[in-house]
Amino acid sequence: EWEGSSAAAEPTVSEAVAAGCDVVAFSGDKLLGGPQAGILAGRGEVIGRLRKHPLLRALRPDKLTLATLLSTLELYRDGHDAQVPTRRMLTAEPAVLRARADKLQQLCAAAGVDAEVVGTQAAVGGGAMPLRTLPSFAVALPAGEATGRGDALARKLEAALRHGEPAVVARIEAGRVLCDVRALVDDSELPLLAQALRQALHSCAGVEAAAAPSGLE
């Protein structure tokens, strides 16, 4: 429950319970940032009945899931929730993201990659906030306006990034590939991403050269 955060967009669990809901179901992963699990909260009487249901044995989580969920909840309880990657990504301030995008662009330039920092909207996605967007910044390739062949080249670059090592999930907008820095855990991933962009561009350049006509009959 992130009061004052730009990520807040719907009633929180505590608000739903306070409003009189007998049971509220929510995910242990997604916005909470813990392991994949389902959590039921609400009136003690109802939760007690659910604990006695025959299906509980089949649906109860294993010890590893419980341990990791407990660790995540303890971070929130103790005020260390900034250590939860999902929380950090969703609550990052635009100024921090702009600085991160600038650093990535500089690393790209040093690696010979022509990129440009652009403002964008990051989609939260998932079942929790499928339509919610947050202001963000991204590095766009190629820099400047896309040419008439931009869409085809962007698709090749996006595919090369997905199949690279490490794999990078980018998106295409207006004929250019965008790498949204809100999706990064922290700045330590920037050098790795810049290198992945360089490798993907070189891979696409090789494909373009191989496909180009030689001029020989």
Enumerate the predicted regions with their spans.
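Conserved PLP-binding catalytic core of the aspartate aminotransferase-like
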Residues: 88-102, 109-157
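C-terminal catalytic subdomain
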Residues: 60-107
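PLP-dependent enzyme catalytic core of the Aspartate aminotransferase-like
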Residues: 78, 143-217
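Conserved PLP-enzyme active-site core in the AAT-like
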Residues: 1-75, 196
